[in-house]
């Protein structure tokens, strides 16, 4: 009996296409990952990303948050490479993968129902990469489409676009070559009406240019929205019903009625610890008064606290009152200090209210650059910023752990903010690492890290183009659509507010933006308002606090930092400097005590704890690559005597012949009558033959020296 094989059919396969920034965008459904709630294969140019969304059928018990996980998987086969790990498998997500996961998470999370407690997984797998077509944008679009057509409750869709600035013109989804020269890299995610996410790095771009880029991206995003809405109409599934999170509104109403005045008094302080102590004392009173009537009240207390505090904070902010008594455009008390730690290369302490960040800068040779093995074009990083957030910074007793996604995201934001002002390697040939230790946190620690990094870099003598400061802007909206924005949000305002709009930059313009939302998006009016007030605030921070602390980078690097010398040689001479099996360069390193890095273009960076070792290594390399020039004078040592002349060493391993007739002015019978081994003499290069042999003349050299002395010219 023969085996029966039937060709597999895909009756639910659909393909949707559109043009996106001059390149084809395709969304394919119904062929891959059929068991997921929804799956979309996104094609953008030659980039391919499979986006799958899955939801648990029942809510998770005992939680008061939405359990959403977003993973952006970078497969090395997508760029035709085998992973460099020991077992040649992809390991944990890299920094860029984590940051991309966060970029996807932030715009989609606020659009899920507030009381949805089912686990939801978003998995974006990069399967092929065309560097002209961003996998990040493809993953955002695919995630939006998959959630929109799935049966998972979600209030999308969203659309995403990158905008660059090339030669003063805005460019949608710039290709690889355009990105290299672009002064702007902003990702804008929109719904049909509002902007829900902004992530930007920029080369000191003015507010009006940034606003125009966001505005145009939002308008362009509507084309994607229309395509995804078409998919929903044609193949979308009905959203499933879910059990709404339980909440005791009766108890909540009693507590707010009985304890409103006491709650306001508890909230009205600029001290985070005092606020928490007052609130905890008030919760004990709730227990005494209501526990008998509501024996299970503990399961609602966290949600009651959140809603109660938000009610107060929202009302106050709309009235122009803040929990610590500040005005909406008032920044908390600031302080800046440099040179905080001994022996480190540079340090800065930035304090804003109860938020304190200690940033420390370390300089090293270029061999310390971070090597990157990813699907992205960048292969190494010279400037690195790392952010640490220990438990004690918020008064929590918890052990130290490796950095999580939040720490990596905050560190990357501060890194992006300072990168445009970091000097080029030709001007400052050091690898640079800044570590920001959050020692106390009451909101805006990422912006504190930006200010602290600037202080540490300047204290370390890094010649940054301009100082950078960061500030955050919050938002509260009323039910009628009216809103108020406020500057420098602290922890409780961040927790209960609707927006954390972080902007970093110099006086000239913006270097980084990150926007987090808890609502359904921002109008253009709110975005413009946020850009305007953050500009004024960061200029005040620079002028009134940071620049009075340290007006410009120190003239020299720390005495504890490695000394650096940069030189350039003919690339053809690199093999001579390295030697067979590295023998020559290893000898130079051993004799001089210096570190040596050689680039393919012939640039050599020499580093050592002291300048003497650098100069010693430089002289060794100069001697190796030395090439005599016809007509030049050299002062060399006699190393060999022959019957026909003397060999003079011009540099180690490089000598030339002075014929007996070119030694003295008078006729001599023997070479020994004019010189002996070890004598030093001036010689002039008269010829270099086709075999590279160098002919010298002592006689011509002395005549030229005499003429220069008579004319008062220096002898080189």
PLM regions and their residue ranges:
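Glycine-rich, flexible beta-strand/loop modules in the N-terminal catalytic cores of phosphate-handling
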Residues: 24, 36-121, 126-133, 192, ...
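Flexible, glycine/charged-enriched surface loops at secondary-structure junctions
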Residues: 114-120, 155-157, 224-242, 273-274, ...
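Extended amphipathic alpha-helical scaffolds
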Residues: 2-56, 241-377, 562-576, 584, ...
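Single-stranded RNA-binding regions, centering on S1/OB-family and related RNA-binding modules
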Residues: 560-562, 571-716
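Conserved helix-loop functional segments at active or binding sites
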Residues: 106-114, 149, 365-368, 390-395, ...
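Conserved phosphate/anionic-ligand binding catalytic regions in large, soluble enzymes, centered on
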Residues: 38-41, 133-151, 338-361, 442-462, ...
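Mobile "lid/hinge" segments at catalytic clefts and subdomain interfaces of large enzymes
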Residues: 151-267, 457-555
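Alpha/propeptide regions of enzymes that mature by internal proteolysis
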Residues: 3-14, 20-23, 37, 48, ...
């Amino acid at each position: 009996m023969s085996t029966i094989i039937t060709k597999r059919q895909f009756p639910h396969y659909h393909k949707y296409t559109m043009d996106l920034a001059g390149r084809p965008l395709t969304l394919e459904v119904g062929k891959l990952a059929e068991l997921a709630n929804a799956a979309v294969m996104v094609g953008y140019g030659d980039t391919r990303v499979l986006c799958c969304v899955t939801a648990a059928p029942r809510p998770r018990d005992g939680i008061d948050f939405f359990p959403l996980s977003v993973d952006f998987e970078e497969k090395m086969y997508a760029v035709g490479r085998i992973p460099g790990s020991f077992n040649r498998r992809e390991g944990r997500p890299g920094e860029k993968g984590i940051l991309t996961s966060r970029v996807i998470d932030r715009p989609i999370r606020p659009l899920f129902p507030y009381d949805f407690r089912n686990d939801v997984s978003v998995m974006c797998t990069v399967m092929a990469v065309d560097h002209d077509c961003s996998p990040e944008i493809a993953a955002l679009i695919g995630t939006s489409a998959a959630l929109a057509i799935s049966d998972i409750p979600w209030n999308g869709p969203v659309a995403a676009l990158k905008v660059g600035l090339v030669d003063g013109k805005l460019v949608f989804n710039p290709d690889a070559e355009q990105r290299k020269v672009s002064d702007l890299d902003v990702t804008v995610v929109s719904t049909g009406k509002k902007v829900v996410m902004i992530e930007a790095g920029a080369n000191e771009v003015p507010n009006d240019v940034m606003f125009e880029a966001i505005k145009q991206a939002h308008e362009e995003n509507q084309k994607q929205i229309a395509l995804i809405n078409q998919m929903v109409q044609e193949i979308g599934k009905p959203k499933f019903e879910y059990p709404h999170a339980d909440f005791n509104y009766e108890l909540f109403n009693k507590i707010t009625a009985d304890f409103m005045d006491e709650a306001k008094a508890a909230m009205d302080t600029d001290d985070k610890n005092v606020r928490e102590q007052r609130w905890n004392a008030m919760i004990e009173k709730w227990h005494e008064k209501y526990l008998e009537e509501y024996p299970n009240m503990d399961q609602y207390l966290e949600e009651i606290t959140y809603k109660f505090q938000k009610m107060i904070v929202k009302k106050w902010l709309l009235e122009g009152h803040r929990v610590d008594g500040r005005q909406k455009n008032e920044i908390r008390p600031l302080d800046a200090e440099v040179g905080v730690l001994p022996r480190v290369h540079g340090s800065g302490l930035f304090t804003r209210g109860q938020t304190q960040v200690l940033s420390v800068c370390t300089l090293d040779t270029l061999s310390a650059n971070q090597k990157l093995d990813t699907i992205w074009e960048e292969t190494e990083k010279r400037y690195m910023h790392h952010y640490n957030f220990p438990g004690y910074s918020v008064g929590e007793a918890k052990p130290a752990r490796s950095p999580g996604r939040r720490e990596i995201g905050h560190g990357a934001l501060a890194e992006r903010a300072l990168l445009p002002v970091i000097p080029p390697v030709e001007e400052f040939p050091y690898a640079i690492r800044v570590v920001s230790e959050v020692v106390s946190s009451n909101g805006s620690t990422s912006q504190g890290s930006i200010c602290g990094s600037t202080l540490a870099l300047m204290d370390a003598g890094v010649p940054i183009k301009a100082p950078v400061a960061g500030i955050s802007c919050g938002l509260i909206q009323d039910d009628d659509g009216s809103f108020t924005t406020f500057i420098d949000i602290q922890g409780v305002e961040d927790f209960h507010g609707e927006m954390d709009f972080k902007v970093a930059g110099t006086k000239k313009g913006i270097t980084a933006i990150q926007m987090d939302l808890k609502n359904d998006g921002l109008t253009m009016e709110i975005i413009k308002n946020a850009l305007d007030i953050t500009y004024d605030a960061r200029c005040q921070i620079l002028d009134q606090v940071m620049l009075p602390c340290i007006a410009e980078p120190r003239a020299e690097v720390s005495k504890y930092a490695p000394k650096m010398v940069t030189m350039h040689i003919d690339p053809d001479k690199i093999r001579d400097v390295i030697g067979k099996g590295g023998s020559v360069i290893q000898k130079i390193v051993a004799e001089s005590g210096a570190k040596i890095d050689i680039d393919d273009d012939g640039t050599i960076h020499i580093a050592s704890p002291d300048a003497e070792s650098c100069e010693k290594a430089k002289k060794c390399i100069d001697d190796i690559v030395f090439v005599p020039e016809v007509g030049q004078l050299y002062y060399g040592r006699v190393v060999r005597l022959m019957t026909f002349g003397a060999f003079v060493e011009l540099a180690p391993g490089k000598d030339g012949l002075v014929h007996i007739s070119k030694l003295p002015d008078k006729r001599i019978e023997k070479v020994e009558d004019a010189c002996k081994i070890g004598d030093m003499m001036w010689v002039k290069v008269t010829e270099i033959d086709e075999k590279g042999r160098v002919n010298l003349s002592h006689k011509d050299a002395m005549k030229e020296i005499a003429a220069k002395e008579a004319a008062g010219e220096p002898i080189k």
